[in-house]
Design a protein with these regions (language model features):
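Conserved N-terminal beta1-alpha1 strand-loop-helix module at the mouth
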Residues: 1-85, 91-94, 98, 106, ...
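Generic beta-sheet signal
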Residues: 6, 63, 109, 132, ...
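Glycine-rich phosphate-binding active-site loops on the catalytic face of alpha/beta enzymes
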Residues: 84-92, 130-140, 182-196
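Short, aromatic/basic amphipathic alpha-helical patches
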Residues: 98-100, 181
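Internal catalytic-core helix/loop-beta-alpha segment
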Residues: 105-113, 130
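Alpha/beta catalytic cores of nucleotide-metabolism and tRNA/nucleoside-modifying enzymes
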Residues: 156, 160-167, 172-196
Length: 196
């Protein structure tokens, strides 16, 4: 299982140094881009993707929490994103089908409050799934769902051993072993890596 470091929780005034200082704790970088509409917060700029691509050698996992996704997927891919996740709550199935036709490595995310059954229709077009386990937009929040219960719900809907499963939100050091045992491929950590 890989660890993806959520840079939203890092020191924004000295980001590259904070990444370097904690480099032994993660495998890739997770970049949350929010718009103040899908979430109650405005997050990182799209430019951070190109800056991190130029200044680090990490795989960049970009998590878009936006009302409008298509033009921003195109931009973050141009800027160097290796994987992009959009949300089923703001991306209908036709838009998502077009995204996966035009771009590689586009995944689908789901909020902790949404019915997991929604993912069935998206599974035809992607094998990358992100289970958000906190309410979106802010770092260092408590979990909104039980991680293992949510994973089991996911497995009951998407039965694909080739899937890449990402769990994002409130993941502690103690959660890592159970997540790996339950088939999670990528665990996103913010506060657990960079501190609170």
């Amino acid at each position: 299982m890989d660890i993806s470091a959520s840079i939203q929780a890092a020191n924004q005034l000295d980001l590259l140094r904070d990444i370097e200082t904690n480099a032994n704790k993660f495998d890739q970088l997770h970049i949350d881009i929010t718009d103040g509409h899908f979430t109650d917060n405005i997050g990182l700029s799209l430019d951070i993707v190109s800056k991190l691509k130029k200044n680090t050698s990490y795989k960049l996992d970009v998590h878009l929490m936006l009302q409008e996704n298509t033009k921003f997927v195109e931009r973050v891919v141009e800027y160097g994103a290796d994987l992009v996740t959009v949300h089923c709550e703001s991306t209908d199935i036709n838009e998502f089908k077009n995204l996966t036709t035009n771009f590689d490595n586009v995944g689908i995310g789901i909020l902790p409050t949404s019915n997991i059954e929604i993912l069935k229709s998206y599974a035809e077009y992607t094998s990358i799934f992100l289970l958000l386990t906190v309410n979106p937009g802010f770092s260092n929040q408590p979990k909104a769902v039980n991680l293992i219960d949510r994973i089991n719900e996911f497995k009951s809907v998407v039965n694909n051993s080739e899937s890449t499963l990402i769990v994002d939100g409130g993941v502690t050091v103690d959660d890592l072993a159970p997540l790996e045992t339950n088939g999670v491929n990528v665990a996103v950590q913010g506060g657990a890596i960079f501190g609170k």
